[in-house]
């Protein structure tokens, strides 16, 4: 099979993975309207083509939280990576490290902090959920600090799990889920051998000690479901800000006022995100939400964005809309499921090449030159409706 884009990795992953795993990563909440709009809205953002700009000295390098990045991309925190490839978090982290970008380890990773951190040279980032068990949160932060994690990504858009219809149909949840998952596994031999048999243990490595002796996926899902905390407020985050002395990023911002609150709180960064369309269906896509947020807080706080990014052109679009850096989620997971570390490495190379093409043809020699001026201005048909008002200048 020829691989030339993330969409090719998606097709390959669908063949390799048991359906419950493929649809868990590929699906979204409710009718998946926001999931679709994340991709579609971003694809409608039109860029200005510029010519004869002498682009021979183009550079993708940038700096974030005093870290040098080879391009403005980091791998997002994605749960259960170790179920998509053998010790998947380690493989993805190695690919990111080799490319000179950060890897973010999820709270609900298969591989624990202590397994992933020593496998790479670059300090990784760590993602933490808001949980009722503050003792677990404090312990996780202590482990992250001990492992040398440089940045904390604090996910705040999950006070309760989203309603994901696909999971019930695919076997991730619902009646007879364990038997359905088993039958799917044995009919997907490549995955069964590489991950099912040789990728053990399949614990959630950062959590397993808190569950005693879990017997299956339902034990982890049950523990998490009972520990998400809907009572959380900005005040509850103060002890984390006091405890964590490195950069702290608030993930799950879609409203300018929440972005301003993050600045007042003292966060170092925010992630404009709707959790990949997996939480509340019907909310704005990240591409639609980003311009107003950038208008409110650009320059006061680092702005990251995720949800809907599938290629290097999308990265350039997000930066033009106001992001400083983007996070890749599903795109790298498709590649990981298809070819492990090599797949993620190849995807990152593709994204870098695509970014260079987009920057060359828009006349942006550096990341700082990708701005609102890079967008086609004043043409509502080319921009999603919610983005058109932020465009300034002449049509090109």
UniProtKB/Swiss-Prot annotation:
Q: Name one GO cellular component term.
A: plasma membrane
Residues that, per the record, bind substrate: 24, 129, 164, 278
Membrane topology value: Peripheral membrane protein
Under Enzyme Commission nomenclature, its number is: 1.1.-.-
Which Pfam family name is an example for this entry?
FMN_dh
Enzyme superclass (EC) = oxidoreductase
Q: Which domain of life is it from?
A: Bacteria
Q: Which terms under GO biological process does the entry name?
A: aerobic respiration; lactate metabolic process
Per UniProt, the keywords (alphabetical) are:
Cell inner membrane, Cell membrane, Flavoprotein, FMN, Membrane, Oxidoreductase
Where do the coiled-coil regions begin and end? none
The catalytic site is made up of 275
- Where along the chain is FMN bound? 106, 127, 155, 251, 306-330
Sample GO molecular function, one term: FMN binding
Q: What is its main location?
A: membrane
Its cofactor is: FMN
**Record's subcellular location:** Cell inner membrane
Q: PROSITE patterns, alphabetically?
A: FMN_HYDROXY_ACID_DH_1, FMN_HYDROXY_ACID_DH_2
Q: Which reaction does it catalyse?
A: (S)-lactate + A = pyruvate + AH2
Ranges where the FMN hydroxy acid dehydrogenase domain occurs: 1-380
Reported function = Catalyzes the conversion of L-lactate to pyruvate. Is coupled to the respiratory chain.
What family classification does the UniProt entry report for this protein?
Answer: Belongs to the FMN-dependent alpha-hydroxy acid dehydrogenase family.
Q: What is this protein called?
A: L-lactate dehydrogenase
- Species this chain originates from: Escherichia coli O139:H28 (strain E24377A / ETEC)
């Amino acid at each position: 099979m020829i691989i030339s884009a993330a969409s090719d990795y998606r097709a390959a992953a669908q063949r390799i993975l048991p359906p419950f795993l493929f649809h868990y990563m590929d699906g979204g909440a409710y009718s998946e309207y926001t999931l679709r709009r994340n991709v579609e809205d971003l694809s409608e953002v039109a860029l200005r083509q510029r010519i004869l700009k002498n682009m021979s000295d183009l550079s993708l390098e940038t700096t974030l939280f005093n870290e040098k990045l080879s391009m403005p991309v980091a791998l997002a925190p994605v749960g259960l990576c170790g179920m998509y490839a053998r010790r998947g978090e380690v493989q993805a982290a190695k690919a990111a490290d080799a490319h000179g970008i950060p890897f973010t380890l999820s709270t609900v990773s298969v591989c624990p902090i202590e397994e992933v951190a020593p496998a790479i040279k670059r300090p990784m980032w760590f993602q933490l959920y808001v949980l009722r068990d503050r003792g677990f949160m404090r312990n996780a932060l202590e482990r992250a600090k001990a492992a040398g994690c440089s940045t904390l990504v604090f996910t705040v858009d999950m006070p309760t799990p989203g309603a994901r219809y696909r999971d019930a149909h695919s076997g991730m949840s619902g009646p007879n889920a364990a038997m359905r998952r088993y039958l799917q596994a044995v009919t997907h031999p490549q995955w069964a051998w590489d991950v099912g048999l040789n990728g053990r243990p399949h614990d959630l490595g950062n959590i397993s000690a808190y569950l005693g002796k879990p017997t299956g996926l339902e034990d982890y899902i049950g523990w998490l479901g009972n520990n998400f905390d809907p009572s959380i407020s900005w005040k509850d985050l103060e002890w984390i800000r006091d405890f964590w002395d490195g950069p702290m990023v608030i993930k799950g911002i879609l409203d300018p006022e929440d972005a301003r609150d993050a600045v007042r709180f003292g966060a170092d960064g925010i992630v404009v995100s709707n959790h990949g369309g997996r939480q509340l269906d019907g909310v704005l896509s990240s591409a639609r939400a980003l311009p107003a947020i950038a208008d409110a807080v650009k320059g006061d706080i680092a702005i990251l964005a995720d949800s809907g990014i599938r290629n290097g052109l999308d990265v350039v679009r997000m930066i033009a809309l106001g992001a400083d850096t983007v996070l890749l989620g599903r795109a790298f997971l498709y590649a990981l499921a298809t070819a492990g570390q090599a797949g993620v490495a190849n995807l990152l190379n593709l994204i870098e090449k695509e970014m260079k093409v987009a920057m060359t043809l828009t006349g942006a020699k550096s990341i700082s030159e990708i701005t609102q001026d890079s967008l086609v201005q004043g043409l509502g048909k080319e921009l999603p409706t919610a983005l058109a008002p932020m465009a300034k200048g002449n049509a090109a």
